[in-house]
Amino acid sequence: MCGIFALLNNYGFFEDEKIKDCFEKGKNRGPEYSEHSKISENFEIGFHRLAINGLNEKSNQPMWIDKICLICNGEIYNFKELFNKIGVKPVTSSDCEIIIHLYKRFGIEYTLSLLDGYFSFIIYDVSCEESQIVYVARDAYGVR
């Protein structure tokens, strides 16, 4: 099971050492790859990868496609069907990539209704210059 990490703080600054310590505590959830990124002055994300699908480096997270960032812990069972349905060729071999494409095309609510699987994810959308959007979601059963 992968580990996802996010920290949003609109009221002050981050103490880098404390943030690093918090992020490192989740490392046992994903020994294959870890990435921590300061996205903006008030938002940081991280990912510890336990690779099951998309076993190449292109499938590492955080995953950025067209100014949309995704970190996801889970498995999307119907990702191939959904790629075919929307006529998009995957950039990576990760089943989670489909979430970005669905979100871009349909928005968050309809995207969630299309996904079959278990997951928790964070989308960070900077495609609109006037604002930045963060969505946090999980599967209906709360498996992740």
Q: Which residue stretches match the model-derived regions?
A:
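N-terminus-centric sequence/structural signature that marks the extreme N-terminus
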Residues: 1-144
